[in-house]
A protein has these predicted regions:
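A short, N-terminal "cap"/entry segment at the start of jelly-roll beta-barrel domains
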Residues: 1-32, 47
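Conserved short histidine dyad/triad with adjacent acidic residue
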Residues: 36-51
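A generic "binding-loop/recognition-motif" signal
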Residues: 42, 53-54, 72, 88-89
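Short beta-strand segments in beta-sandwich/barrel cores
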Residues: 45-46, 63-68
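Glycine- and acidic-residue-biased ligand/ion/polar-headgroup-sensing regions
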Residues: 53-65
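Short acidic-glycine-tyrosine-enriched beta hairpin
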Residues: 71-86
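Ligand-binding loop in jelly-roll beta-barrel domains
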Residues: 86-111
Length: 111
């Protein structure tokens, strides 16, 4: 199956997972798994959450972000990939002093 993000409706998810501002995403959902292109403007974030029954892969396309993984912060930039295993806890934010949007691709699979 080929997915074209530009053909998937853009959704705006305010305070996603308890984060700041909103996550804008072109999100495909097959009833079990999610594949999406996400955008966080400066100051926006995805709140801290745990993947109880899923795992997630995030690939940073452009911009800079701060990833919180199990209580430790890591700077992520274009070309970085993050894997959150089942049971893992994380969040992602675009620092408010950032000059550009944080664009990323993510896949959340049930495992």
């Amino acid at each position: 199956m080929i997915l074209k993000y530009d053909d998937i409706p853009l959704v705006h998810l305010p305070a996603f997972k308890g984060g700041e501002k909103e996550l804008a995403a072109n999100m495909f959902f097959d009833g079990t798994n999610r594949i999406f292109r996400g955008r966080l403007v400066p100051g926006a974030s995805i709140g801290v959450h745990t993947h109880e029954d899923s795992c997630e892969v995030i690939n940073v396309v452009s911009g800079m972000g701060v990833l919180l993984e199990e209580g430790m912060e890591h700077e992520v930039t274009a070309g970085d990939c993050f894997y959150c295993p089942k049971g893992g806890t994380h969040s992602l934010r675009n620092p408010s002093d950032a000059q550009e949007d944080l664009l990323f691709l993510a896949t959340v699979c049930q495992c």
